[in-house]
Amino acid sequence: MGDDAVNSTAVQFNRDAILKELNDKGYCVIPDVLTSDECDVYIGKYRDWLATFGEDEAPFQRHSIIQSYRVGHLEPTWEVRLKAKSVFQTIWQTDKLLSSVDGIAIAEPPEKKSQEFHTPNTNWFHLDQSAMRVGFHGYQGAVYLEEASENDYCFRVLVGSPKLYESFYDRDEIEAEAKKSNELGHYMLSNNDVAWYHQHGCYPRKVPVPKGGMVVWDARLVHDNCRPEEGRPNKDRWRFVVFVCMTPARWARKKDLQLKREAYEKLMMTSHWPSQGIALKKKRLAHLEEEHRIEKLPGVARSHEAKLLAGVEEYDFEDGRPNGPDWEPQWSEL
């Protein structure tokens, strides 16, 4: 697993090691969040869902990321989300958290149907934190149900880029109108933007993640993913990833909680953000979505813990137990 993996006790005990990695590089790989057997069970459930599609209806989407079909509410997605909670609980030092209802990533091997491989010198680098958010706002995460080596479908980052977040958005080249259009969404970098980061010492690095591991990153980190490389050793390796983000529940405002309840009750997807600046995902695929989506929440999503994470049930912030950091994220007006 190399230098990018923190010892497996990190989930419970090594918070300092996780935070050091996040501060130094902007990301951290944590192994053994799930066991191999757990991963195989969840993969099996996703394969059962995939089997409901016809040959020409497969839900594989651009960059392997699926944010439709209510996938954020599928049983295995909620099960993985609950398993990943311990990581965020370690980071935030509280179990009073809210979760995004985020997407998943599934991709079949490109060797299977002569599909596209990675093209050198291409990228879709982006920031998931807009200029409206000042400074640090949270950590994103992705749980890997299958191993991803550097030549597989692999997460890629500009190392250290969170430290340049304010400087990047303060440039004259970034127009205020462009910032406004991305108040809650992400910013797609141009070639000139990427060159600017390179000039400031931030270079691309692929980040391998072991099966059952999780990569956590500062939301100010510039990142994308790369398609598998042609001639890779593991020609039959799929991609199965579940995206999870959790932040302290005490940060949420009334309007945020209203949107979270709507997402839960209507089985809607949300953006990456769990506590502030919630955005609901709109339907994208009309008839296909209706045919292959679930119509009611699975049992695991109706548990007390899941309802707390979804913002449907309320935490007791006066019970004497830790509520998380005593500061709140800052916002700007453009």
Model-flagged regions — what are they?
Residues 173, 211-216, 220-334:
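Non-heme Fe(II)/2-oxoglutarate
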Residues 106-109, 158-166, 245-251:
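Short edge-strand/loop segments of extracellular domains
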Residues 2-24, 31-132:
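Non-heme Fe(II)-dependent double-stranded beta-helix
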Residues 89-98, 131-135, 144-152, 164:
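Secondary-structure boundary elements
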Residues 138, 148-222:
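Double-stranded beta-helix
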Residues 27, 101, 136-142, 152-154, ...:
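Extracellular structured ligand-interaction cores
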Residues 130-150, 208-211, 245-248:
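Short, conserved beta-strand element in jelly-roll/cupin
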Residues 115-118, 123, 151-160, 166-170, ...:
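A short secondary-structure junction signal
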